[in-house]
Amino acid sequence: LRNECSRFFMCFPAGYKVTNSDVEQILSHNREESAFTMFDAMLESLPPAKRLENSLSILQKILLSKKDNSPVVIIAGLVSCFRRLSMWQTIHSQGHIPSDIELKSNGFSSKTAQRQYAKAAKLWTPGHVAAILALLAKTDLEIRSTGSLFQENQLTLMLYEIILKNGAYCARYETD
């Protein structure tokens, strides 16, 4: 606790009275981000442009961190989330309401996960999820084949296509 509280001394001048909002602001900036927190940001009850902005902010934090900042790790985490969403949609297909035992046996034991995937299922249809999984595979292949030169741009475009276009690829303008 002493170690954690000592961070506040570096953030504020001597004699400053730290408020709850100050603590929240410091802790939110020190929170460790991952593909899973990015998935949560994609689900927020905000307009798509704001969800994209928040997801891009998390992407920047991940890329600047020393731990798990590889695009392959980021994409793998998102693939895991969208595969679980696909499983959730399959369990709930055709109006079927699964029991708690059925949900737990499929990996949705916590109420938080159940709320998260119920919210995601309202945002993306099974068709969208299939398109997003294909997009994630395409982006992974492109990043592995082109190297690190354009990886940030490719990840940014991928997030745009997931959040604003529901997995549809951006059209390319071609001239003769």
Where are these regions (language model features)?
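Conserved AAA+ ATPase small/helical "lid" subdomain
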Residues: L1-P13
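C-terminal alpha-helical interaction modules of replication/initiation AAA+ assemblies
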Residues: M10-S21, Q25-L27, S34-D176
